[in-house]
């Protein structure tokens, strides 16, 4: 599933390609993917200008003229691309936004899990998981005071805590593993046992890891592509994720893989000791 760095990379690509363009027609080939009903969804967007492409956590927010905002969640396999309209539809191109420059903004999703909700601008934070989403992982919004309070007032494994979108927005399986390795914290360490120093290091590790991943245009482990159709490159910089059996880049101990919070979880048993 695309996490914050991947969605931010898609956002930047789409902003450069489609902001200012007018939607002349919308083709919905899989009606369960959109809300409201496909006919209304298409009718409301026809003739609207794309004003802005934003992001909140793992969600894309596309603002249109007429005070509409589309909330788009890529889920597992969703991808956006901008192509020449003469190009044939792909098998998994499910929603097509025809633009006034002769190109299409196409949404492709092999597993059909992605969703698009069109709502009046200002109501986008009432859609799905956005109702309870936590702060963005930036120094301004993820303060040390906030993080300390949330960790100290909960008795949860650290991997589960980081995956909880109501605690911190945007982290998923890949970056949770990587952040915990950077912080030398075991994935099953209980949140309220962290020291002040560990919490401070964890916070800085979150900022560092996500910034590096955004600069590398995300991680492509399976099928993620950005809006230009290119893979990310951060998979070449991963320390633990999908590296089970390989030596830890810090101490040489083989990386192990266990199941935590129903997710495959990678860590170094020497650097990340469970207390």
Curated annotation (Swiss-Prot):
Stretch forming the signal peptide: none
Active-site feature positions: 2-3, 58, 263
UniProt-listed Enzyme Commission number(s): 3.2.2.23, 4.2.99.18
Positions of DNA binding: 92, 111, 154
Cofactor note: Binds 1 zinc ion per subunit.
Keyword Chaperone belongs to the record: no
Keywords in alphabetical order: DNA damage, DNA repair, DNA-binding, Glycosidase, Hydrolase, Lyase, Metal-binding, Multifunctional enzyme, Zinc, Zinc-finger
Mapped zinc finger ranges (FPG-type): 239-273
Cofactor(s) listed in the protein's UniProt record: Zn(2+)
GO terms for MF: 8-oxo-7,8-dihydroguanine DNA N-glycosylase activity; class I DNA-(apurinic or apyrimidinic site) endonuclease activity; damaged DNA binding; zinc ion binding
Coiled coil: none
Catalytic activity, reaction form: Hydrolysis of DNA containing ring-opened 7-methylguanine residues, releasing 2,6-diamino-4-hydroxy-5-(N-methyl)formamidopyrimidine; 2'-deoxyribonucleotide-(2'-deoxyribose 5'-phosphate)-2'-deoxyribonucleotide-DNA = a 3'-end 2'-deoxyribonucleotide-(2,3-dehydro-2,3-deoxyribose 5'-phosphate)-DNA + a 5'-end 5'-phospho-2'-deoxyribonucleoside-DNA + H(+)
Superkingdom of source: Bacteria
SMART domains hit by this protein: Fapy_DNA_glyco, H2TH
GO biological process annotation, one example: base-excision repair
Family: Belongs to the FPG family.
Free-text function comment from the UniProt entry: Involved in base excision repair of DNA damaged by oxidation or by mutagenic agents. Acts as a DNA glycosylase that recognizes and removes damaged bases. Has a preference for oxidized purines, such as 7,8-dihydro-8-oxoguanine (8-oxoG). Has AP (apurinic/apyrimidinic) lyase activity and introduces nicks in the DNA strand. Cleaves the DNA backbone by beta-delta elimination to generate a single-strand break at the site of the removed base with both 3'- and 5'-phosphates.
Quaternary structure and partners: Monomer.
Protein name: Formamidopyrimidine-DNA glycosylase
């Amino acid at each position: 599933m695309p996490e914050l760095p991947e969605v931010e990379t898609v956002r930047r690509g789409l902003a450069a390609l489609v902001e200012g363009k007018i939607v002349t027609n919308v083709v919905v080939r899989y009606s369960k993917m959109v809300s409201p009903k496909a006919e209304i969804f298409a009718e409301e967007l026809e003739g609207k200008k794309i004003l802005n492409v934003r992001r909140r956590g793992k969600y894309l927010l596309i603002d249109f003229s007429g005070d509409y905002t589309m909330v788009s969640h890529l889920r597992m396999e969703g991808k956006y691309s901008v192509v020449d309209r003469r190009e044939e539809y792909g098998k998994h191109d499910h929603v097509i936004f025809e633009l006034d420059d002769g190109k299409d903004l196409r949404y492709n999703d092999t597993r059909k899990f992605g969703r698009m909700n069109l709502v009046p601008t200002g109501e986008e934070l009432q859609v799905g998981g956005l109702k309870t989403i936590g702060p963005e992982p930036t120094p301004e919004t993820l303060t040390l005071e906030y993080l300390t309070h949330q960790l100290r007032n909960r008795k949860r494994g650290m991997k589960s805590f980081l995956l909880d979108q109501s605690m911190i927005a945007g982290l998923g399986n890949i970056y949770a593993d990587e952040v915990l390795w950077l912080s030398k914290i075991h994935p099953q360490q209980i949140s309220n046992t962290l020291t002040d120093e560990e919490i401070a290091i964890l916070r800085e590790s979150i900022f560092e890891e996500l910034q590096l991943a955004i600069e590398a245009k995300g991680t492509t482990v399976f099928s993620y592509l950005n809006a230009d159709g290119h893979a990310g490159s951060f998979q070449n910089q991963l320390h633990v994720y999908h590296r089970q059996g390989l030596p830890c880049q810090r101490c040489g101990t083989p990386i192990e893989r266990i199941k935590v919070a129903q997710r495959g979880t990678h860590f170094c048993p020497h650097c990340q000791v469970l207390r």
